[in-house]
Amino acid sequence: VDGVDVNETTHDQFLERFGMLFQGGALFDSLSVWKNVAFRLQRGSQKRSKDEAREISIKKLRRVGLGPEIADKYPAELSGGMQKRVSLARAIATDPEIIFFDEPTTGLDPIMSSVINELIREIVVELGVTAMTITHDMGSVMAIADQVAMLHDGKIQWCGPRSKLKDSGNPYVNQFIYGTSKGPIKTLR
């Protein structure tokens, strides 16, 4: 990965390079917000003291627009948008080099989706990280992507800059982005 033979690294060395925002947030319901954010900071090669981990958690929560007053709350006490922000804070807690975003706006209303997309774009640029996003949300694609790859049946059907997406001339891309039932992607009726 990025010129490093992963077979010659430890599991911790490999994982410390990555952050992940899961589709459903994947927050631990038995852990407070700050402990969710600090999950990777409390184990492995990046282990920090409890106080330092909490301090970093609060800093990352602030970065995603949440105040320290939610640090001791539990995920069930938060709205869906707040949970997504906590998940984003956890994804950046270790200052990773690469972040994966799996359907980052799933379950959010259009306004919160826009807020999360803006946060993702800002954070990726600010941290200078590589980001890979898996999404079917074309609003997210247009808001956060630089390069786009269209996958269908396990194959890349098209790859190119976001600016060329609507003029790709690719029938798979066109069917998907315009949401038509006619085209090479089989639909059920």
Task: Name every feature range the model reports, one short phrase each.
Residues D95:
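Conserved catalytic motifs of ABC-family nucleotide-binding domains
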Residues L31-F39:
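Short coil-to-helix segment of the ABC ATPase nucleotide-binding domain corresponding to the Q-loop/switch region
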Residues K50-E69:
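Conserved ABC ATPase "signature" region
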Residues V1-Q13:
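ABC ATPase NBD Q-loop/coupling interface
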Residues Y74-L78, M82:
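Conserved ABC ATPase signature
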Residues I99-D102:
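Catalytic Walker B motif of ABC-type/P-loop ATPase nucleotide-binding domains
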